[in-house]
Amino acid sequence: MKKSKYYQLLNGTWKFYFVDSYKNLPANITDPAISTADWADIKVPGNWEVQGHGVAIYTNHGYEFQPRNPQPPTLPEANPVGVYRRDIDIPADWDGRDIYLHLAGAKSGVYVYINGQEVGYSEDSKNSAEFLINKFVKPGKNVLTLKIYRWSTGSYLECQDFWRISGIERDVFLYSQPKAALKDFRVTSTLDDTYKDGIFKLGVDLRNNGSTAGNMTLVYELLDANGKVVATGEKATNVAAGETRTVSFDQTLPDVKTWSSEAPNLYKLVMTVKENGKVNEIIPFNVGFRRIEIKPTEQLARNGKPYVCLFINGQPLKLKGVNIHEHNPATGHYMTEELMRKDFELMKQHNLNTVRLCHYPQDRRFYELCDEYGLYVYDEANIESHGMYYDLAKGGTLGNNPEWLKAHMDRTINMFERNKNYPSLTFWSLGNEAGNGYNFYQTYLWVKNADKDIMNRPVNYERAQWEWNSDMYVPAISGCRLAGGNGQTRQ
């Protein structure tokens, strides 16, 4: 996408206005007519605390804005706000297309304005937020303003053990699509029972945002590492105005090269969308063939029952991994590709094969690089309410409070829908240290159902422990504590 004329990266220097409390914010702060001559400059992406605005706070499990007796969803009056502003240019040849503003990550509560009009709001800071902005922009110069509150109601679900800092943390960009375009797709790329032949399934949602019905066609090609086409398909469908239709493909491929940590073989999927015979867009994506299973082995435990193990491509797998946070002393939570690659190279040099995203989804590029390097990803929803602790009674953990079900579900769905097709995505996690209960029972069932016809990956949640809503339980922390607290020193 980045090489397309229908893509504009908005990273760089923006104008920035900061106040320690939202009460000190001028009423007309989003008016595009006001001067920004006395505003500061700020680098985007990059948290504002590492650029001289506000105070960075580190804490483990308390809410930094209400460390004692938290009362969700209430927030303090001394809630800092950062206002970002820059001009954007809408090319004339984007006219008649759908235009989107994409925020890859901003913390915490983000209000979006274009030319002074409110466009929308988002508060899931570690997932993408996307806004259709056709009716707010005109060809040529427009003014984009982001008003970001340091703390929002979403902060009650973002109580992770890391530096609590604020602002734009990932890329900001514009892109445009034809009215008749690809909306979403789902890739199944697993193996048959011989673990040699590949089972390839593709479902593509074609969307028509035009004013009249259109004949839409999806053509796909699957190419191996040498550029040879190993599978292809084409289907056409009539899509009414304002509607979405799905086309599906199913094919078995002999003797595929499998994807694993030891040999991360990738195929290239190229999807072409046509409208009335004319090419509208071309979308590439990497595909890896792997089969993920949890199943009994022939080896018996002391109780006479078979051991149950994790298998990849028919082989038992021992996970050797690390937790990873987004953190860099120069830019805060913004991680460049160069830094990501350094991390991955260190991991591979130390024979690691797994990375747990603690405790939120990472940037898209992170997953693409895991596909390339061969790392099993334990993806985790951006949910941790550790500051509420784990009491199942009313007023305790948010994980058992039905009033917070939608917030838990939205964050889980955001993670799943964005990341479901990456070959490295091996495990789903419902969150971390957020208690258990009704909300996590529901998110577990949702993910199991959503993934059952795609890759049927294990769904895990550490606070479930021995309850039914987790497919794996690995007491890693307690094991490390025991190992480090036995009073013996290794020589």
Predicted features and spans:
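Surface beta-strand/loop "capping" patches
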Residues: 179-210, 301-306
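Substrate-binding/catalytic cleft of secreted carbohydrate-active enzymes
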Residues: 344-347, 354-491
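Short glycine/proline/serine/threonine-rich loop/turn segments at secondary-structure transition edges
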Residues: 94-98, 137-141, 253-268
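Beta-strand-rich binding/interaction modules
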Residues: 112-114, 197-238, 245-249
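Accessory beta-strand-rich segments of carbohydrate-active enzymes
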Residues: 17-21, 47-55, 74-184, 209-210, ...
